[in-house]
Regions:
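Short, small-residue-biased leader/transition segments that mark boundaries at the very start
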Residues: 1-2
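Short, hydrophobic beta-strand segments
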Residues: 7-11, 48-54
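Long hydrophobic segments that form regular secondary structure
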Residues: 11-38
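Helix N-cap motif at beta-to-alpha junctions
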Residues: 17, 54-62
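Short amphipathic alpha-helices in soluble, non-transmembrane regions
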Residues: 24-25, 64-72
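A common structural junction motif
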Residues: 30-35, 69-77
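Short, ordered loop/turn segments at secondary-structure junctions
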Residues: 40-43
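Glycine-rich, acidic loop segments that terminate in or are immediately followed by a histidine
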Residues: 59-66, 76
């Protein structure tokens, strides 16, 4: 059985529109992400937001963290 180490990278966003999300998903898959998805969340003061998640090889975690910061309005990522 083959086991592969993967990284989970996430960020919460409250000011992103669907077009930017779609663009990011396409770029991340083109760059080699294993999976990319966004989940609706409720943020503080009951504001709607999005949890953006990228699964990638552990060796690519820095690359996808930088992509998230460059292509979205995120101030940081959770790894």
């Amino acid at each position: 059985m083959l086991f592969r180490s993967v990284a989970l990278i996430e960020t919460n966003l409250d000011d992103i529109n669907a077009e930017i999300l779609g663009h990011f998903v396409e770029k991340a898959f083109a760059a080699g992400a294993l999976d990319v998805f966004h989940t609706p969340i409720q943020m503080k003061k009951n504001r709607p937001g999005v949890l953006l998640t990228v699964l990638c090889a552990s060796t690519d975690a820095d690359k996808f963290s930088e992509l998230l910061l460059r292509e979205t309005s995120a101030f940081g990522v959770r790894r």
